[in-house]
Amino acid sequence: METIAIRNIVELVSINKKAKEHLAKIKSEFVLTFEELYILVYVYKGERDCYNVKDIVKQSKFKPYYISKAIQSLKDKGLIAKKRNEKDERTVAIQVSKAQHKKIKNLLMDIEAEIL
């Protein structure tokens, strides 16, 4: 995700307040946590069919537990699939089909239309 420059403390507080309002609306209307939303945006921007969960944890700086929980929820919603590496069972990857990519794109567009 890109870095946004914040010029002063007033701007920081204003942005934070607005972000919290948007995230609360996303959580209530679209039933998505911030971690789930982060993963969906990560997948949408990546446009690949397979993602290593360790890379998402490293990029997001979220605790692995929260990412695992979010991935399971997204899997339950049919937005992604999970698979384990055949050579190393400890390694988990996210797989995203073309149909799932389309669902993710449409969901993110719906969220943008509702929020922005």
Over which residues does each language-model region extend?
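Charged, amphipathic alpha-helical coiled-coil/dimerization segments
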Residues: Q72-L116
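Surface-exposed, interaction-prone regions with an acidic/low-complexity signature
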Residues: M1-I4, V10, F34, P64, ...
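N-terminal helix-turn-helix DNA-binding core of bacterial DNA-binding proteins
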Residues: E21-K63
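Short alpha-helical linear motifs
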Residues: Q59-Y65, D76-A81
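Aromatic-residue detector
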Residues: V10, S28, Y42, R48, ...
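General structural signal for secondary-structure boundaries
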Residues: M1-A5, C50-Y51, K63-P64, Q95-A99, ...
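N-terminal leader segment of winged-helix/HTH proteins
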Residues: M1-F30, K77-L79, K87, Q95
